């Protein structure tokens, strides 16, 4: 059985690091900080005239999905991933993205490669409806290999305080609606690379798998879906109680972040079609089911939590916005967490 830890990623150590960092960050908080470390986005209160608004910020990267871009020498879509990882996070609080900044660090500056990366970032910003206002490109010889780079982003969005989504009103019987992902998105690539032996044999990325209908490389470089515009449409008409972006940590880590302690989510596994890429990963790597749901999005990139009476309207809006979605579970009172059924 192959695990994420076998591939070099220690989730538990990551949790320990966050817990050590929390107290240091809290020492810097002023009275306008209204979320603790660990939320999808960081919320900062603004008083503007008679209204209260919240700035919601987030930062993220693309992870080792970049390795696939290096092997295929294709760099024009990873920027979309970078934007998606950031804007989808702040969307979990109902925030509309305002502006975005990027950070590119490389071993040797290649102007055409950087332009291709930023082309993707700009495309992602257009898809999210935000402005790309700046960034930093750092050339670091001897630190990165000449043909490699790292990519990260930072976004700021805004939401009226009374409309902010924070999960506090989630209750027993509320319904989880899963929004389709475009594929693996930007998490779990260290495990993917291990399962398919990509680092030892990058040529495997050119192999066309019948189950996928395209090459492995094409499948793995599909950009992360940006949910901003369809979900903001839902938020205009529906009281969405909680939103979870399914990223690192999969279902088990991210869904509980969208509701209070003392509740758990029951997920009906057969309620949506798991994309072929995840079945291949599980089969080739002999990865246990729980490990799959702890590492990957399994075809569900975002989860909305709504009251039962709002399900039909939510599904109708998502259909109008051309987003495939399914009712995938319910909220129950009890021990915190997620139960796969």
UniProtKB/Swiss-Prot annotation:
Domain of life per record: Bacteria
Molecular function terms, GO-annotated: ATP binding; phosphoribosylamine-glycine ligase activity; phosphoribosylformylglycinamidine cyclo-ligase activity
Enzyme class: ligase
Pfam family, one: AIRS_C
Record keywords, A-Z: ATP-binding, Cytoplasm, Ligase, Nucleotide-binding, Purine biosynthesis
Cytoplasm listed as a keyword: yes
Reactions catalysed: 2-formamido-N(1)-(5-O-phospho-beta-D-ribosyl)acetamidine + ATP = 5-amino-1-(5-phospho-beta-D-ribosyl)imidazole + ADP + phosphate + H(+)
Keyword Ligase: yes
Pathway: Purine metabolism; IMP biosynthesis via de novo pathway; 5-amino-1-(5-phospho-D-ribosyl)imidazole from N(2)-formyl-N(1)-(5-phospho-D-ribosyl)glycinamide: step 2/2
Localization in the cell: Cytoplasm
Biological processes per GO annotation: 'de novo' IMP biosynthetic process; adenine biosynthetic process
Primary subcellular site in the record, as a coarse category: cytoplasm
Cited InterPro entries: PurM-like_C_dom, PurM-like_C_sf, PurM-like_N, PurM-like_N_sf, PurM_cligase
Enzyme Commission designation: 6.3.3.1
Cellular compartments per GO CC: cytosol
Family: Belongs to the AIR synthase family.
HAMAP family: AIRS (MF_00741)
Protein name (database record): Phosphoribosylformylglycinamidine cyclo-ligase
């Amino acid at each position: 059985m192959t695990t994420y830890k076998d591939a070099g990623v220690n989730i538990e150590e990551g949790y320990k690091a966050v817990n050590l960092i929390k107290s240091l960050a809290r020492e810097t908080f002023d009275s306008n900080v209204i979320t603790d470390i660990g939320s999808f986005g960081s919320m900062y209160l603004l008083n503007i005239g008679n209204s209260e608004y919240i700035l919601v910020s987030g930062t993220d990267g693309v992870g080792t999905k970049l390795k696939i871009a290096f092997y295929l020498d294709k760099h024009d879509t990873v920027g979309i991933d970078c934007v998606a990882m950031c804007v989808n996070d702040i969307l979990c609080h109902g925030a509309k993205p305002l502006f975005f900044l990027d950070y590119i660090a490389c071993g040797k500056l290649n102007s055409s490669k950087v332009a291709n990366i930023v082309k993707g970032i700009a495309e992602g910003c257009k898809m999210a409806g935000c402005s790309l206002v700046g960034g930093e490109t750092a050339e670091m010889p001897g630190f990165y290999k000449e043909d490699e780079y790292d990519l990260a982003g930072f976004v700021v969005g805004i939401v009226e305080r009374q409309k902010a989504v924070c999960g506090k009103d989630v209750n027993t019987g509320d319904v989880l609606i899963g929004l389709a992902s475009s594929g693996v998105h930007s998490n779990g690539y260290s495990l993917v690379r291990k399962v398919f032996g990509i680092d030892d044999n990058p040529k495997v990325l050119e192999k066309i798998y019948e189950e996928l209908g395209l090459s492995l490389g094409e499948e793995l470089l599909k950009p992360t879906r940006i949910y901003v515009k369809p979900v903001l449409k839902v938020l205009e008409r529906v009281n969405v109680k909680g939103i979870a972006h399914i990223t690192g940590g999969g279902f088990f880590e991210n869904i509980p972040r969208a509701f209070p302690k003392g509740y758990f989510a029951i997920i009906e596994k057969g309620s949506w079609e798991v994309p072929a890429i995840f079945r291949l990963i599980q089969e080739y790597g002999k990865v246990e089911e729980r490990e799959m749901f702890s590492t990957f999005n399994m075809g569900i990139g975002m989860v909305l939590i709504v009251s039962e009476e709002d399900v039909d309207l939510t599904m109708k809006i998502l259909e109008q916005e051309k987003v495939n979605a399914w009712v995938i579970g319910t909220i129950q009172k009890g021990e915190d967490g997620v139960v796969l059924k």
